[in-house]
Swiss-Prot record:
It comes from the Eukaryota. This is Small ribosomal subunit protein uS8. The keyword NAD does not apply. Belongs to the universal ribosomal protein uS8 family. Keywords: Ribonucleoprotein, Ribosomal protein. It comes from Candida glabrata (strain ATCC 2001 / BCRC 20586 / JCM 3761 / NBRC 0622 / NRRL Y-65 / CBS 138). The lineage of its organism: Eukaryota, Fungi, Dikarya, Ascomycota, Saccharomycotina.
């Protein structure tokens, strides 16, 4: 089976492990985008600690789950989002206002939509988490 997206596979593995009540999940292969996405999720408390394991191939990540995650997903293709359009995307993707985050990749790094609005940067939409 061919991989559509490494990030999509990682978030799908996290979703499935969370639904089945697992305490941790192994993600492979690893990438910088996955690590930055997980850092944003960890900052907002959706996941616990995660550890990168270098196996001299593509790497692995072990993520500790804490049961707070409802859903996370990838938006494909990665649409360009202007600062004014962020509100429309949050309304479409998230179940309610003030609940969940849309994660963007910007010139200032990978961040959630609130941080992007504060820093006044726009970019491409990666995914969502709530």
């Amino acid at each position: 089976m061919t991989r559509s997206s490494v990030l999509a596979d990682a978030l799908n593995a996290i979703n499935n492990a969370e639904k089945t009540g697992k305490r941790q999940v192994l993600i492979r292969p690893s990438s910088k985008v996955i690590i930055k996405f997980l850092q944003v999720m960890q900052r907002h408390g959706y996941i616990g600690e995660f550890e990168y394991i270098d196996d001299h191939r593509s790497g692995k990540i072990v993520v500790q789950l804490n049961g707070r995650l409802n859903k996370c997903g990838v938006i494909s293709p990665r649409f360009n989002v202007k600062i004014g359009d962020i509100e429309k995307w949050t309304a479409n993707l998230l179940p309610a206002r003030q609940f969940g985050y849309v994660i963007l990749t910007t010139s200032a790094g990978i961040m959630d939509h609130e941080e992007a609005r504060r820093k006044h940067v726009s970019g491409k939409i990666l995914g969502f988490v709530y």
